[in-house]
Amino acid sequence: ADGGEASMCLNGIRCAAAYVWRNNFAPKKIIKFKTKNRIVVCEPYKNQVKATLQIPSIYIDTKLDKKIAKLTSDKFSLVDAGNMHLCIKSTSVKNKDLNSIYKNLEKLIKPLGFNLSIYKLSKKIADMRTYENGVGETFSCGSAALAVASLCIQDKFKTISPGGELNFIKKNNANIEMMGPTKYIYSGNINV
């Protein structure tokens, strides 16, 4: 990681909620998190954590769209999901060189803070991979999954990334729920 700060981390927020409940820092009920640009409401859900937030919006930049279209023939969308994401629909995800795709687009998208996701759609499921600015390819990115889901969802949707699955339910025209597991790995102390 390059030390840069993201606007939010949805998987991190879900893990923070699970940590609070696990350690009895607050009752096991709704917790609201305020990020740089979103309110995320978390609540327990069948041994998982459900996060509810506003449906992402399409980012409109016709000049950027034209520049990206010169570098990829695949359908793509620019999405503001709390973090900015360039989502490219592909016929394959596993066999793609995500690093090369990112490097090809980096000069256009990195200065604007766009992460890159490629996804393959199959009915109500998207297989996906994400390259985050300053990090590289990640096992799972919650805001990327949210961005892809927002492009494809009618009522229910699932994303599958190398790190696992997230499920989405569109609640109305304004909100979407994201459900997924959290896993407690270890705890430690830092002396300062």
Where are these predicted regions, by residue range?
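Active-site proximal loop and beta-alpha junction motif in alpha/beta enzyme cores
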Residues: 1-8, 13-140, 147-192
